């Protein structure tokens, strides 16, 4: 079947009231961005609907791209026809005939958005269903759980018929919720956290703490590759690479071993807050899950939070590890995340880290460090890489 138009539906956007136009424009921008290599395609919107006019492009190739776009509730490949009822009946039958496998049951659902159309929706349903039943006596109507729903949308700009509905990612279009800075470690959790934040409509930048020579160039490349995976859903990611060796060395030499992770995380938050301020990010995001490791108890989170004022978003906080792993497989980050390259947290992990650190003790242990000087130096030497949607393409400059 040669489809004419892909009809895009968006559910949550319809609830946004006064901001509706802004949200719809952001979704149009996202759709145009993922379809930019389909030169014949045109994207337009009308109240409550968006249309991708194919002009001969492969409908299924286009729909594969649409599966990456947050903010889409569902979409359907459609044929556009004249509003003449006989034409509607014939084209609906043609669509049902080409389904493989053939459905055993069906239902017709028409929507008469153009109220000038002379036939009521219920009558359109009856006429189209009767025509299909006469031509295909092996199938029957089921109004409750049909194998196939034949959708007929009669609108002022055209009549659209479809038999397939593909579920979209849902969520909100990227860019409508402000900017968030993701702490990207290279493990399983943080890329999933980034993906979930993208689903809530944020623009994503990432920060990574690199401890060369304790961590290798391959560990940094793994993080670049994970950031590249996220560009599939959110576009270009600016990756801030922070030199962290001097800070970790100072902490290891001067602070109690059981508080190493806690103090190290407090430094990460201080640096991340500075970078967020410089990039106009309104929150940090981490891959922490409550109770998963020693540094992710409520007491640890509280002690770490004390040193900054910017919000910290933890989208995985109530998730089980198995659910996080499932998402990482779905978004194709799992195999990268389990590559055996150590990050800055794992190379300095103490044997018995404190699980219920006290903010007062953490602050006292930090008194032997020149906290402000260490933070300022790390921020000054941070490098930025632009991770684009193109394979493994990066550009580097100084922060």
Curated annotation (Swiss-Prot):
<dbReference type="GO" id="GO:0002937">
    <property type="term" value="P:tRNA 4-thiouridine biosynthesis"/>
</dbReference>
<comment type="function">
    <text>Catalyzes the ATP-dependent transfer of a sulfur to tRNA to produce 4-thiouridine in position 8 of tRNAs, which functions as a near-UV photosensor. Also catalyzes the transfer of sulfur to the sulfur carrier protein ThiS, forming ThiS-thiocarboxylate. This is a step in the synthesis of thiazole, in the thiamine biosynthesis pathway. The sulfur is donated as persulfide by IscS.</text>
</comment>
<dbReference type="GO" id="GO:0005829">
    <property type="term" value="C:cytosol"/>
</dbReference>
<dbReference type="InterPro" id="IPR049961">
    <property type="entry name" value="ThiI_N"/>
</dbReference>
<keyword id="KW-0067">ATP-binding</keyword>
<keyword id="KW-0784">Thiamine biosynthesis</keyword>
<keyword id="KW-0694">RNA-binding</keyword>
<dbReference type="InterPro" id="IPR054173">
    <property type="entry name" value="ThiI_fer"/>
</dbReference>
<dbReference type="GO" id="GO:0009229">
    <property type="term" value="P:thiamine diphosphate biosynthetic process"/>
</dbReference>
<dbReference type="InterPro" id="IPR003720">
    <property type="entry name" value="tRNA_STrfase"/>
</dbReference>
<keyword id="KW-0547">Nucleotide-binding</keyword>
<feature type="binding site">
    <location>
        <position position="265"/>
    </location>
    <ligand>
        <name>ATP</name>
    </ligand>
</feature>
<dbReference type="InterPro" id="IPR004114">
    <property type="entry name" value="THUMP_dom"/>
</dbReference>
<dbReference type="Pfam" id="PF22025">
    <property type="entry name" value="ThiI_fer"/>
</dbReference>
<keyword id="KW-0963">Cytoplasm</keyword>
<dbReference type="GO" id="GO:0000049">
    <property type="term" value="F:tRNA binding"/>
</dbReference>
<keyword id="KW-0820">tRNA-binding</keyword>
<dbReference type="Pfam" id="PF02926">
    <property type="entry name" value="THUMP"/>
</dbReference>
<feature type="domain" description="THUMP">
    <location>
        <begin position="60"/>
        <end position="165"/>
    </location>
</feature>
<dbReference type="InterPro" id="IPR050102">
    <property type="entry name" value="tRNA_sulfurtransferase_ThiI"/>
</dbReference>
<dbReference type="InterPro" id="IPR014729">
    <property type="entry name" value="Rossmann-like_a/b/a_fold"/>
</dbReference>
<dbReference type="InterPro" id="IPR049962">
    <property type="entry name" value="THUMP_ThiI"/>
</dbReference>
<keyword id="KW-0808">Transferase</keyword>
<feature type="binding site">
    <location>
        <position position="296"/>
    </location>
    <ligand>
        <name>ATP</name>
    </ligand>
</feature>
<dbReference type="GO" id="GO:0140741">
    <property type="term" value="F:tRNA-uracil-4 sulfurtransferase activity"/>
</dbReference>
<dbReference type="GO" id="GO:0052837">
    <property type="term" value="P:thiazole biosynthetic process"/>
</dbReference>
<comment type="pathway">
    <text>Cofactor biosynthesis; thiamine diphosphate biosynthesis.</text>
</comment>
<dbReference type="GO" id="GO:0005524">
    <property type="term" value="F:ATP binding"/>
</dbReference>
<dbReference type="GO" id="GO:0009228">
    <property type="term" value="P:thiamine biosynthetic process"/>
</dbReference>
<comment type="similarity">
    <text>Belongs to the ThiI family.</text>
</comment>
<dbReference type="InterPro" id="IPR020536">
    <property type="entry name" value="ThiI_AANH"/>
</dbReference>
<dbReference type="GO" id="GO:0004810">
    <property type="term" value="F:CCA tRNA nucleotidyltransferase activity"/>
</dbReference>
<dbReference type="Pfam" id="PF02568">
    <property type="entry name" value="ThiI"/>
</dbReference>
<protein>
    <recommendedName>
        <fullName>Probable tRNA sulfurtransferase</fullName>
        <ecNumber>2.8.1.4</ecNumber>
    </recommendedName>
</protein>
<feature type="binding site">
    <location>
        <begin position="208"/>
        <end position="209"/>
    </location>
    <ligand>
        <name>ATP</name>
    </ligand>
</feature>
<feature type="binding site">
    <location>
        <position position="287"/>
    </location>
    <ligand>
        <name>ATP</name>
    </ligand>
</feature>
<feature type="binding site">
    <location>
        <begin position="183"/>
        <end position="184"/>
    </location>
    <ligand>
        <name>ATP</name>
    </ligand>
</feature>
């Amino acid at each position: 079947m040669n489809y004419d138009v892909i009809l895009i539906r968006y559910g949550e956007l319809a609830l946004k009231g006064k901001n509706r136009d802004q949200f719809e424009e952001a979704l149009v921008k996202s759709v145009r961005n993922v379809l930019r290599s389909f030169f014949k395609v045109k994207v337009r919107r009308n109240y409550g609907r968006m249309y991708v006019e194919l002009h001969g492009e492969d409908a299924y190739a286009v729909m594969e791209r649409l599966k990456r776009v947050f903010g889409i509730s569902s979409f359907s490949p459609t044929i556009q026809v004249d509003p003449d009822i006989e034409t509607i009946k014939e084209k609906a039958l043609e669509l049902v005939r080409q389904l493989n496998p053939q459905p055993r049951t069906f239902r017709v659902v028409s929507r008469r958005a153009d109220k000038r159309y002379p036939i009521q929706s219920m009558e359109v349903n009856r006429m189209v269903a009767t025509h299909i039943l006469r031509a295909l006596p092996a199938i029957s109507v089921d109004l409750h759980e049909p194998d196939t729903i034949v959708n007929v949308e009669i609108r002022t700009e055209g009549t659209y018929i479809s038999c397939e509905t593909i579920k979209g990612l849902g969520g909100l279009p990227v860019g409508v919720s402000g900017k968030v800075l993701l702490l990207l470690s290279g493990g399983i959790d943080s890329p999933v956290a980034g993906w979930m934040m993208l689903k809530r409509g944020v623009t994503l930048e990432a920060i990574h703490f690199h401890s060369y020579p304790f961590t290798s160039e391959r560990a940094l490349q793994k993080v670049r590759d994970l950031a590249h995976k996220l560009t599939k859903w959110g576009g270009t990611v600016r990756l801030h690479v922070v030199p962290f060796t001097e800070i970790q060395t100072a902490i290891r030499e001067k602070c109690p071993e059981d508080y190493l992770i806690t103090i190290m995380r407090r430094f990460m938050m201080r640096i991340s807050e500075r970078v967020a301020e410089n990039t106009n990010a309104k929150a940090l995001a981490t891959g922490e899950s409550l109770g998963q490791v020693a540094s992710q108890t409520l007491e640890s989170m509280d002690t770490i939070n004390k040193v900054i004022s910017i919000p910290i978003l933890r989208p995985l906080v109530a998730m089980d590890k198995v659910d996080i792993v499932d998402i990482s497989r779905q978004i194709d980050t799992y195999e990268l995340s389990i590559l055996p390259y150590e990050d800055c947290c794992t190379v300095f992990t103490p044997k018995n880290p404190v699980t219920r650190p006290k903010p007062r003790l953490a602050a006292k242990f930090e008194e032997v460090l020149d906290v402000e000087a260490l933070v300022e130096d790390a921020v000054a030497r941070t490098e930025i890489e632009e991770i684009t949607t193109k394979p493994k393409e990066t550009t580097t400059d100084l922060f």
